[in-house]
Amino acid sequence: MGKKKPVLVVMAAGMGSRYGGMKQIDPVDEYGHIIIDFSIYDAVRAGFEKVVFIIKKENEELFREGIGARISKKVEVAYVYQDLNALPDGFSVPDGRVKPWGTGHAVLSCRGVVDGPFAVINADDYYGSHAFAMAYQYLTSEDEQSEDGKYHYMMVGYQIENTLTENGYVSRGICETDTDDYLQDINERTHIEKRGEETAYTEDDGKRSEERR
């Protein structure tokens, strides 16, 4: 049996909560394209033939009409729901919790739909064509497990200065790698911004300390 083709998993369950509504279906250019259109276009060019959207069930109709119906003309599309209550045995939802769980829980929602190599992206981020080309090349050239039984993973990283904006601060996961470019750690910085020609972050809105790199 040949190796299964990579699938693109798109996390979209938190779209409405992060932006106060489904703003990601609003056009970003004069041709009516939305952000996810660019990612799907680049993914298909790289070789991906199937996309799985992780969504909230209550957003399904709006999502299908605004995104899925158009994209399904170019690539196979499937949907899964990120259900707050869909937890492994022994876990329960804390009282008052309404916000979706994180990335791990979102990807867990794909069990039964994704059974081969896959890449995961956010629906509302722009990655660039190189990211999908690198991911697809890796997923089609590497075995899922090595001889010692360990799974293989990869991540596309970006130079921090290329991900900043002139319009305030951003949150980013800062990656630490070893000399062979293997990931060692990720530290979330929630307030990173440009300060002149430098990049700075603070953990307390600048009240006590500031580090630059």
Language model features with spans:
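Conserved beta-strand scaffold positions in the cores of enzyme catalytic domains, especially
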Residues: 25, 77-79, 153-155
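Conserved core of the sugar-phosphate nucleotidyltransferase
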Residues: 129-213
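Conserved catalytic-core motifs of eukaryotic protein kinase domains, centered on the activation segment
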Residues: 21-22
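Conserved N-terminal catalytic core of the sugar/cofactor nucleotidyltransferase
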Residues: 1-16, 30-120, 127-134, 141, ...
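Generic secondary-structure boundary signal with a strong preference for alpha-helix termini
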Residues: 26-28, 32, 114, 136, ...
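Active-site flanking residues adjacent to catalytic metal/cofactor-binding acidic residues
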Residues: 121-124, 158
